Regions:
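Juxta-kinase regulatory segment immediately upstream of eukaryotic protein kinase catalytic domains
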Residues: 1-5
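Conserved N-terminal boundary motif of the eukaryotic protein kinase catalytic domain
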Residues: 8-12
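Protein kinase glycine-rich loop
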Residues: 14-17
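Active-site acidic catalytic loop and adjacent metal/ATP-binding pocket
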Residues: 19-28, 34-35, 173-220
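Conserved ATP-binding subdomain of kinase catalytic cores across diverse folds
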Residues: 22, 40-140
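ATP-dependent phospho-/nucleotidyl transfer catalytic cores
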Residues: 44-47, 103-115, 132-187, 192, ...
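Active-site activation/catalytic loop segments of kinase-like enzymes and analogous catalytic loops
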Residues: 219-252, 267-286
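Conserved small/polar residues in nucleotide/adenosyl-binding loops
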Residues: 304-308
Length: 308
């Protein structure tokens, strides 16, 4: 009711796939909504997260309209509580209307779906290239700082992990990071489960979960998305990667193929380092998986990023 939803509550369902926030699907006589409690251990200043989301959605919708596209149904619309689109009450809460006829899945199998996923991300980057990144808050300092996140492992016992692998990746990244170009507004967490699938067309229709939006490199978004959608049995599926790349570049964004390649390698190695760091130190960024599962995910990342 704090968000102005007056009609009767019917039931709720906890959605458990997210690593960070607590998410619930709320059914009421007024409609279906998605309610989230933001993890303030990860997002120390959640108000700034919502400021970034407001700025991003406003910018993209304006760009879409200028290009003759309809933004309706393409993004979550957050509901206000008073003057804000969030509520502070025993935590930090927000709610938005459930986008009808949509689902999320953890993996895409069909190359047509993967190609459309690439096009959706390419369109996102095309529209965010012109955004003024000085307007964005840094909500997670050091997030996707590849060199910093990998090099922090170097202080641990070299026998505790694959030191040589990370040293090779680190040196290669430092030598080639100029390829990445300039920073722009990016999503920073593009993966299959953050894409809505329209159940009528069976095609990706919207990107969600904008909490990590900050200035960054579009190549890292490309790499994150390709890692999530184009791997089978811990190996890159070239057919899927070609489909994803075809869709991405068809959207007209300006990223180079070399930058995309470096983004895929770097972001996957960084993810491996984060799983390993959590496992070694007992940190709890990935709150829904235990130490053993983190190690398994670390090894999975190693399998498809190990240099030849």
């Amino acid at each position: 009711s704090e968000f102005g939803i007056k009609s009767g509550y019917i039931k709720y369902k906890k959605l458990g796939e997210g690593h960070i926030n607590d998410t619930y699907k709320i059914y009421s006589s007024e409609g279906v909504f998605i309610l989230q409690k933001i993890n303030t251990d990860v997002f120390k200043e959640p108000e700034k997260v919502m400021q970034n989301i407001d700025f991003t959605l406003s910018h993209i919708k304006k760009e879409m309209l200028l290009n003759g596209e309809n933004p309706d149904g393409r993004f979550p619309d957050y509901i206000k509580s008073g003057i804000n689109n969030y509520l502070k009450y025993n935590g930090f809460w927000r709610i938005y209307k459930y986008l009808e006829n949509t689902i999320t899945v953890n993996k895409f199998q069909n190359t047509d779906i993967i190609q459309q996923f690439g096009k959706l991300l390419g369109s996102f980057h095309k529209y965010t290239e012109s955004a003024d990144i000085t307007r964005l808050n840094i909500t997670i300092p050091g997030f996707h700082n590849i060199s910093e996140n990998i090099s922090r492992l170097f202080s641990f016992n070299k026998n505790a992990y694959d030191y040589n692998f990370f040293k090779k990746i680190y040196d290669y990244y430092i030598s080639n990071r100029y390829i990445l170009g300039t920073k722009q507004l990016v999503h920073n967490d593009v993966k299959c489960s953050n894409i809505l699938i329209n159940t009528k067309s069976n095609m990706p229709c919207a990107i969600i979960d904008f909490d990590t939006i900050m200035p960054g490199y579009a190549a890292f978004d490309f790499g994150d998305a390709a890692r999530s959608s184009c791997t089978d049995d811990n190996k890159i599926n070239i057919t899927k990667l070609k489909a994803f790349s075809k869709g991405y570049f068809s959207a007209g964004c300006s990223l180079s193929a070399k930058a995309c390649s470096l983004g895929l390698l770097s972001i996957t190695a960084e993810l491996a380092s984060r799983y390993l760091y959590d496992s070694i130190t007992g940190c709890n960024y990935f709150k829904n998986i235990n130490a053993s599962e983190k190690l398994n995910k670390f090894y999975s990342c190693l399998l498809y990023t190990s240099p030849s």
